Every structure is written in C-alpha cells, then in structure tokens.
Amino acid sequence: MNERIVVAVDAMGGDNAPEVEVEGAVAAARRWKIPIVLVGDQGRLDAVLSRYDLKGLDIAIRHATEVVGMHDSPSDAVRKKKDSSIRVAFDLLRGNEVQAVVSAGNSGATMAVGMFLCKRIPGIDRPAIATILPNKKSQTVLLDGGANVDCKPFHLSQFGTMGAVYAKFMLGKERPRVGVLSNGEEESKGNELAREAHKLLKQSSLNYIGFVEGRDIFSGDVDVVVCDGFVGNVVLKVSEGLSEAISDMLRGEIKQRLFAKLGYLLARPAFRAFKKKVDYAEYGGAPLLGIQGTGMICHGGSNARAIMNAIHMARESVSQRINDRLIAQLGMENPELSDDVVKRGAS
C-alpha cells in the first residue's frame, strides 16, 4: 500500500482505557504496520507503552487533558470539553494529520464531535452507525445502530445508500440486497416510517428487496438492513444478550452431564470456530457513515483484539475510499446535487 494512512485512537475512551487501547494499537501496528497516534494523557500513555517492545512500530502520542465519560452529554462533549481525547482525535482528522479515528468511548459524543468538526457529506442529513452482524452465509450491515432514535423516511433511504456502498466495497457484496426492517414482508405491514421509506427505496437504483423481518438479519438473505436507531439499538442489545445467554446455558448443560463433557471435547474446534464467528471483537467496531472522514465506534467494553481489528477496519475504509464512493452513489441517487457540491464533499 503506497498511501500512508494514519489512524488516531481515542486512548481514554472505553471501560478499560487506556490499557486496552494501547495493547490493541501495539498489536495493529505490529501486525499491519499501521501508523497510529494515541490521543490522551501523555503520562498515563507513556507508562502503559513502556511495557511493550516498540521497536519498528510507528506509534506517537498526542496529549489531551480531558476525557468524555460515558455519562457526559454529546453537547457537553462538543461545547465544554474542548481538549478531550475524542475532540483532539477528530481535530487531527479535520486537519488531515490522521485519516481515521477509532474510539470505544461515548458513542453519542463521538458522533456529535465527528459531525461538528468534520461536517456531513453533502446529501446526507443524518450520519449513521453501521453495525456488522454475522449471518449464516457471511455478514449483514445493520443501520442505524443507535445514532438516530427518531428518523424520517428519507433518512432510512439514505441509510440504505450508505449501507449498500459499505457492503459492496468492504464486505465484497457485488450488488448488495437492501431491506427495510419491518414486522412482516407484505407491503401492508410496518409502521408509517417503514412504509414511506419502502416507497422511497423502491424508486432508488439500489438492489432493494422490500420489507425484511428480524430473523432475516441472520439468514444471509439480505445484505443491508435499515431501520431507525431506536429499533436498531434494541436489535443489537437483544442479539448480544441472546448470544451470551445461549453460551451460558450451553456451558451449564455441558457441566452437568458426563457424556456432554466428552462430546464437547470432540466438538471443541467447532465451538471455537462458532465463538469466533459471533464474537464482536472479530468485527472491531461500527463505522460512523456520513461524515467527511472515517470514524470507527467500538463497544465500550472492547478488548484489545476488538481495538486492533477496529484500527484495521478503519485503515481499510480509507484505503477503499468509502466516502468518495458514497459521494458518487449519492450523485446517482440525487442528480440535483451539483458537481461543485459533490467535489467539495470529496475534498
């Protein structure tokens, strides 16, 4: 790769910062030779970095005196904490000192700061969190994952465009199938938001397949599922809770039965492969789509592997020119976007 792509990591965001962020950054720098800027308290970061062999690694520190906590409001993150780690990270992105930002901190604050400093892509009214979920065949993109709890139909239509571009160039889906999440596949189903979004998407150039149900997210029969952020976040939390509950229940049943223990020993490779497939750490983070820059939002409880993979995903998003491709697709969907506006968004 000829292009130098530098990733800024909000090293103070998340439940286990900065240790997890530093460990993940070191792993990503070592494995993929990614230049990384850790943003946060210089003293704490120096202390954690001293535990690692950094020879040959391109890791720098940018000092930030404040931290946006999980209970801080997005408005406070924008207006009051102007030297927070997440704010400084996006300042670096805005100034083109880095090409992507990764954060496991307050997701609402991350989105607010990203929008405030980097602005929206022309033609996008609401940036969205695109979450990658495993399905029986590969992966499904779900958006919005929680950034916008109240949406209008044209927002969902824009989510479909953003998700389709991401699925095509990041997940290798040549012609991504896009569906609106509803309570049934029939056109008479759904609430007003879903039905109106359905009408808009039918008129688009996307490979729109109509309404899809919750079970379809994991079937592999749809590549991009759009919904408002309230529904999307509920879907994610239910999926996460169900996965943990099934694992715990299965583990409990195995412990109670001798033959089950023996069977588990034989099936251990399959269990490990399954666990890896459904582990959020393997997917790193959720891209924040729709801002003029690349942002990756990680789970607050992310481990080092999740941070490492999020850094890699961020680098790949920049390498694949996701924003440029999104601007081009928006131009196809909205011919009224003038050439000069599109060019401004790409610059």
UniProtKB/Swiss-Prot annotation:
Reactions accelerated catalytically: a fatty acyl-[ACP] + phosphate = an acyl phosphate + holo-[ACP]
GO cellular component terms, semicolon-separated: cytoplasm
Chief subcellular location: cytoplasm
Enzyme class of the recorded protein, top EC level: transferase
One Pfam match: FA_synthesis
Keywords linked to the UniProt accession: Cytoplasm, Lipid biosynthesis, Lipid metabolism, Phospholipid biosynthesis, Phospholipid metabolism, Transferase
Pathway given in the UniProt record: Lipid metabolism; phospholipid metabolism
InterPro entries documented for this protein: FA_synthesis, Phospholipid_synth_PlsX-like
EC number: 2.3.1.274
Keyword Ion transport (UniProt): no
GO biological process entries: fatty acid biosynthetic process; phospholipid biosynthetic process
Compartmental location: Cytoplasm
GO terms assigned for molecular function: phosphate:acyl-[acyl carrier protein] acyltransferase activity
Top-rank lineage group of the source organism: Bacteria
Subunit structure of this chain's protein: Homodimer. Probably interacts with PlsY.
Family: Belongs to the PlsX family.
Function field: Catalyzes the reversible formation of acyl-phosphate (acyl-PO(4)) from acyl-[acyl-carrier-protein] (acyl-ACP). This enzyme utilizes acyl-ACP as fatty acyl donor, but not acyl-CoA.
Cross-referenced NCBIfam families: plsX (TIGR00182)
Record protein name field: Phosphate acyltransferase
Organism: Syntrophotalea carbinolica (strain DSM 2380 / NBRC 103641 / GraBd1)
Name of encoding gene: plsX
